[in-house]
UniProtKB/Swiss-Prot annotation:
GO biological process: isoleucine biosynthetic process; L-valine biosynthetic process
Start and end residues of each KARI C-terminal knotted domain: 209-353, 354-486
Co-factor binding comment: Binds 2 magnesium ions per subunit.
Positions annotated to bind substrate: S414
Function: Involved in the biosynthesis of branched-chain amino acids (BCAA). Catalyzes an alkyl-migration followed by a ketol-acid reduction of (S)-2-acetolactate (S2AL) to yield (R)-2,3-dihydroxy-isovalerate. In the isomerase reaction, S2AL is rearranged via a Mg-dependent methyl migration to produce 3-hydroxy-3-methyl-2-ketobutyrate (HMKB). In the reductase reaction, this 2-ketoacid undergoes a metal-dependent reduction by NADPH to yield (R)-2,3-dihydroxy-isovalerate.
Protein name per its UniProtKB record: Ketol-acid reductoisomerase (NADP(+))
Pathway as given in its UniProt record: Amino-acid biosynthesis; L-isoleucine biosynthesis; L-isoleucine from 2-oxobutanoate: step 2/4; Amino-acid biosynthesis; L-valine biosynthesis; L-valine from pyruvate: step 2/4
Source organism per UniProt: Shewanella oneidensis (strain ATCC 700550 / JCM 31522 / CIP 106686 / LMG 19005 / NCIMB 14063 / MR-1)
Residues that coordinate or bind Mg(2+) 2: D217, E389, E393
Cofactor(s) needed for function: Mg(2+)
A single Gene Ontology CC term: cytosol
Positions contributing to Mg(2+) 1 binding: D217, E221
Length: 492
């Protein structure tokens, strides 16, 4: 199989990268009726598989799970979860031939083998769906021409998909139709109905392409979503301990600090996050963020270049073929870091303290979001896609670190995301270590001295303008406003 993106000419590549349209709520007036009586079979019962299935069943659809015979015979976790929730479970041979819609929600590295196994069993004219397009775009999987191929990709972990649905809402969702596999011209209708069944239409749906989803998703998870958080945690902890901060407190300030500062980001973007700082702290966070961007911009651009060219996928798939040797080694090394092994502190930290003593953390988030967003847009990815793969998902990943540090983050994210995170982290740590070590303790761990809160008015005005007037802030305000409006409509 050859990389699908690389098989296209430049004009086709740019057209696919630039596909992104925020769909109007009225386009989902038919709900999930288009697939109401279909037999829908889900492959994989992990977080996305189980929670999407629960939502779709609650929306009135017919859901079953196809598992490998050994998973059923040995009553593995996937079988246990599906049966505990009252779903019909069977083998591929038992369920796939009668399926109208097959949802491939298995891990990326299993896609080629899984799709190769189910395709001969799928009936003429059936539909195959993905929640991530890596197999189609990077591996170049070719699907039988009579099969419709779609994507429905909720922009959050599977548990959040379920919780938001139970609240009567949903999560922002990306949908796409593979242009090589839309024989009946109804791929978009199927994807819309599927997204509606999971609750995605209540939060906002982007009509995109397989290529735009893959390239932006890989970039976001490698840089701001995982790589920057891991790098900041490791270096920030080392810095505080070297400055004499008690290890448990240092770890807690970072572990819970990521979640606290990105909660402000979630509600009001970079502007709101920065406004949580005092005026002197805001100025310093802005200056640090500018320094970080200068240092890291070439690394962000290299990751984007390697993602666009297919170099990242090529090297990662080599590691797949080598039994994940690099991934497993890097995972073990992360588990040995000081941050991961620091004692758990029971000391209470007030919410505002995470901002006051975490100026560096705020600067890392600001720099990472802006760099990731701007780098994606400069590569031809539309702003809305870049926003969802940078600022929007950052609080969701920070929440995982708040539970069990980097271990939890790397368990929850895909192996593809984890591999890319380690690549970024290994390059970013040596780039930033001297800068972080040279910082004043006031910027992480101690907080600014209370002697004066005075600032230069003109400097503050200029910095406030620079914070507010960026593309990521403009598009973020628009998309967050849409979600707020939708919550009001759904709750009415």
């Amino acid at each position: 199989m050859a990389n699908y993106f690389n098989s296209l000419n430049l004009r086709q590549q740019l057209a696919q990268l630039g596909q992104c349209r925020f769909m109007d709520r009225s386009e989902f007036s038919d709900g999930c009726n288009y697939i109401k009586d279909w037999n829908i079979v889900i492959l994989g019962c992990g977080a996305q598989g189980l929670n999407q299935g629960l939502n779709m069943r609650d929306s009135g659809l017919n859901i079953a799970y196809a598992l490998r015979p050994e998973a059923i015979a040995q009553k593995r976790a996937s079988w246990q979860k599906a049966t505990d929730n009252g779903f019909k479970v069977g083998t591929f041979e038992e369920l796939i031939p009668s399926a109208d819609l097959v949802l491939n929600l298995t891990p990326d590295k299993q896609h080629s083998n899984v799709v190769s196994a189910v395709m001969p069993l799928m009936k003429q004219g059936a539909t195959l769906s993905y929640s991530h397009g890596f197999n189609i775009v990077e591996e170049g999987m070719q699907i039988r021409p009579d099969i419709t191929v779609i994507m429905v990709a909720p922009k959050c972990p599977g548990t959040e998909v379920r919780e938001e649905y139970k609240r009567g809402f949903g999560v922002p969702t990306l949908i796409a139709v593979h242009p090589e596999n839309d024989p009946n011209g109804d791929g978009l209708d199927i994807a819309k109905a599927y997204a509606s069944a999971t609750g995605g239409d209540r939060a906002g749906v982007l009509q995109s392409s397989f290529i735009a989803e893959v390239k932006s998703d890989l970039m976001g998870e490698q840089t701001i979503l995982c790589g920057m958080l891991q790098t900041g945690a490791i270096l920030g902890y080392e810095k505080m301990v070297a400055d004499g901060v008690e290890p448990g407190y240092a770890a807690k300030l970072i572990q819970q600090g990521w979640e606290t500062v990105t909660e402000a980001l979630k509600h009001g973007g970079i502007t709101n996050m920065m406004d949580r700082l005092s005026n002197p702290a805001k100025i310093k966070a802005f200056e640090i963020a500018e320094d970080l961007k200068d240092i890291l911009q070439p690394l962000f651009e290299k990751h984007m270049d390697d993602i666009i060219s297919g170099e990242f996928s090529r090297t990662m798939m080599q590691d797949w073929a080598n039994d994940d040797a690099n991934l497993l080694r890097w995972r073990a090394e992360t588990g040995e870091t000081g941050f991961e092994n620091a004692p758990v502190s029971s000391e209470h930290i007030d919410e505002q303290t995470y901002f006051d003593k975490g100026i560096f953390l705020v600067a890392m988030i600001k720099a990472g979001v802006e760099l990731a967003f701007d780098t994606m847009v400069s590569a031809g990815i539309v702003e809305e896609s870049a926003y969802y793969e940078s600022l929007h998902e950052t609080p969701l990943i920070a929440n995982t670190i708040a539970r069990k540090r980097l271990y939890e983050m790397n368990v929850v994210i895909s192996d593809t995301a984890e591999y890319g995170c380690y690549l970024f982290n290994h390059a970013a740590v040596p780039l930033l270590r001297d800068y972080v070590n040279a910082m004043s303790p006031e910027y992480l761990g101690a907080g600014l001295k209370d002697s004066s809160n005075s600032v230069d008015n003109l400097q503050l005005i200029a910095i406030n303008d620079a914070i507010r007037h960026t593309a990521v802030e403009y598009v973020g305000a628009e998309l967050r406003g849409y979600m707020t409006d939708m919550k009001s409509i759904v709750g009415a």
